[in-house]
Curated annotation (Swiss-Prot):
Protein's gene: Cdc37
Keyword field: Cell cycle, Cell division, Chaperone, Chromosome partition, Cytoplasm, Developmental protein, Meiosis, Mitosis, Phosphoprotein
Bias-annotated ranges (Basic and acidic residues): 1-11, 361-378
One GO MF term attached to the UniProt entry: protein tyrosine kinase activator activity
Keyword match Phosphoprotein: yes
Protein's recorded name: Hsp90 co-chaperone Cdc37
InterPro entries for the chain: Cdc37, Cdc37_C, Cdc37_Hsp90-bd, Cdc37_Hsp90-bd_sf, Cdc37_N_dom
Protein's job: Co-chaperone that binds to numerous kinases and promotes their interaction with the Hsp90 complex, resulting in stabilization and promotion of their activity. Required for cytokinesis and chromosome segregation in mitosis and male meiosis.
Subcellular location, record wording: Cytoplasm
GO term, biological process aspect, one: positive regulation of ERK1 and ERK2 cascade
Pfam families documented for this protein: CDC37_C (PF08564), CDC37_M (PF08565), CDC37_N (PF03234)
Residues that bear Phosphoserine: S13, S296, S355
PANTHER family per the UniProt record, alphabetical: CDC37-RELATED (PTHR12800), HSP90 CO-CHAPERONE CDC37 (PTHR12800:SF4)
Region (Disordered): 1-26, 342-389
Length: 389
C-alpha cells in the first residue's frame, strides 16, 4: 500500500489558495518565497558552522590523545582537556541530531520537492575548416590584390603590435584577417623591410607573421576554422612549456634567415635587371654592346678609337688581314662604334650648302673651307673608359 502522508505537508503556493481580498496574491507569493529562501540560507549556514566545529573537534581530539600516549605534558591536565573535548563532541552530536529532525519536519517546497534524475550537456560542434577552393593562379592573385586593397592598413596595424594580449584582441575584433592572405602580406612586407635595411622592424613583423602561421597550422591540425583558434593559440603561447617556446623562437629565427636570403636575391635581381636595361639602351643597330665590342678589339684598334684618329684607323685596318679587318669593322658597325658611308652623307650635305652659298653670291673663307674639309671625314662614335667600367 502506498503511503501518501509525505505529500500532505507541502509548502507550494497555488493560485487557487484562499487569500484576503485586501491582500495582493502575487505579492503574498513573493513574500512567502523570500521567507522560505531566507530560512533555507540560514539552514545552510548552520550546517557549514557545524561542519567547521566538527573538523576542529576531531583535530583537537586526535592531538590530545597523541600527547597522552606519548606522555607529553601533565597527564592530569591532559585528561581533563580530553574530557572537555569529548563533552563538546557529544554536544555537537546533539545539535546535529536536532538539525536532522528539523530538516525532516521542514515542508517540501518548489525548490526541494524534486531533484534532477539526470543531466544532459550539449556541446556545440566547432565550425569546420573551410576547404581550400580550387582557384586558378590568376584568381588567387586577383583575390590577394583585392584583400590588400581593402585591409592593408589593418594588416600593418597587426604587424606593429607587440603584446600577445593586444594581438589577440585585435584579431578577435577583425576575424576576417585570420587567413592565408594576411600571412602572405606579412611575408612580402618583411622582405621589403629587409631590402630597405630596416632590420629591427623586419624582425618584429616576422614575429607577427609566425604567430599567424601557427594559428593556421593549429586550425589544420584540429580541422576547424582558423578564427576559432585565435584564443587557443595566444593562451598556449603565453603559458607554454619551455620546449614549445624554444621551438617557436627557433621557427622565428629560421624565418628571418629565409627573409634575409630572399631580400638579397631580390636585390641582386634588381641590379641585374638595371644592368640589362642599361646594356639594351646602348646596343648598336646590329644588336651588339659597344663596350663588349671595344673590349674584344686588338690593342691597336682600341688606340685608334680612343684617340679618335681616322688616319691611324685606316692605316691599322690596311695593315691587318682582310678577313680579320672585315670581322672587326662589321662588329664595330653593328655596335655603333663606326657609322658607314658617313662621308657620302656629309658630302651631299656639303654640296647642298655650296649651292646655297653660290646662289647667294657668298664666298667661303679659309675657316669655312677647313670646316668643310673636316666634314668630309667619316663619322664614328668613340667609347670612353667609363663605359667599359
Amino acid at each position: 500500500m502506498v503511503d501518501y502522508s509525505k505529500w500532505k505537508n507541502i509548502e507550494i503556493s497555488d493560485d487557487e489558495d484562499d487569500t484576503h481580498p485586501n491582500i495582493d496574491t502575487p505579492s503574498l507569493f513573493r513574500w512567502r518565497h523570500q521567507a522560505r529562501v531566507e530560512r533555507m540560507a540560514e539552514m545552510d549556514h548552520e550546517k557549514d558552522e557545524l561542519k567547521k566545529k566538527r573538523q576542529s573537534y576531531q583535530a583537537r581530539l586526535m592531538d590530545v590523545k597523541e600527547r597522552i600516549s606519548k606522555k607529553d605534558g601533565d597527564e592530569e591536565a591532559l585528561k581533563k582537556e580530553l574530557e572537555k573535548i569529548e563533552a563538546e563532541g557529544k554536544e555537537l552530536d546533539r545539535i546535529e541530531s536536532e538539525m536532522i529532525k528539523k530538516e525532516k519536519k521542514t515542508p517540501w517546497n518548489v525548490d526541494t520537492i524534486s531533484k534532477p534524475g539526470f543531466e544532459k550537456t550539449v556541446i556545440n560542434k566547432k565550425a569546420g575548416r573551410k576547404p581550400d577552393e580550387n582557384l586558378s593562379e590568376e584568381e588567387r592573385e586577383q583575390r590577394m590584390k583585392q584583400f590588400v586593397k581593402e585591409n592593408e592598413k589593418l594588416c600593418q596595424q597587426y604587424g606593429m603590435l607587440r603584446k600577445y594580449d593586444d594581438s589577440k584582441r585585435f584579431l578577435q575584433e577583425h576575424l576576417h584577417l585570420v587567413g592565408e592572405e594576411t600571412a602572405n602580406y606579412l611575408v612580402i612586407w618583411s622582405i621589403n623591410l629587409e631590402m630597405e635595411e630596416k632590420h629591427e622592424l623586419m624582425a618584429h613583423v616576422a614575429h607577427q607573421c609566425i604567430c599567424m602561421q601557427y594559428i593556421l597550422e593549429l586550425a589544420k591540425q584540429l580541422d576547424v576554422d582558423p578564427r576559432a583558434c585565435v584564443s587557443s593559440f595566444f593562451s598556449k603561447i603565453q603559458h607554454c612549456h619551455p620546449e614549445y617556446r624554444a621551438q617557436f623562437d627557433s621557427e622565428i629565427e629560421g624565418f628571418k634567415g629565409r627573409i634575409q636570403k630572399r631580400a638579397q636575391e631580390k636585390i641582386q635581381e634588381a641590379i641585374a635587371q638595371a644592368e640589362e636595361e642599361e646594356r639594351k639602351e646602348r646596343l648598336g643597330p646590329g644588336g651588339l654592346d659597344p663596350a663588349d665590342v671595344f673590349e674584344s678589339l686588338p690593342d691597336e684598334l682600341k688606340a685608334c678609337f680612343e684617340s679618335r684618329d681616322v688616319e691611324l684607323l685606316q692605316k691599322t685596318i690596311a695593315a691587318m688581314p682582310v678577313d680579320v679587318a672585315k670581322l672587326h669593322m662589321k662588329r664595330c658597325v653593328d655596335s655603333g662604334l663606326w657609322v658607314p658611308n658617313a662621308a657620302d652623307l656629309e658630302g651631299d650635305k656639303k654640296e647642298e650648302d655650296d649651292s646655297d652659298d653660290v646662289a647667294g653670291g657668298e664666298e667661303k673663307t679659309d675657316d669655312a673651307k677647313s670646316e668643310s674639309a673636316a666634314k668630309e671625314e667619316p663619322i664614328y662614335t668613340g667609347v670612353s673608359t667609363e663605359d667599359v667600367d
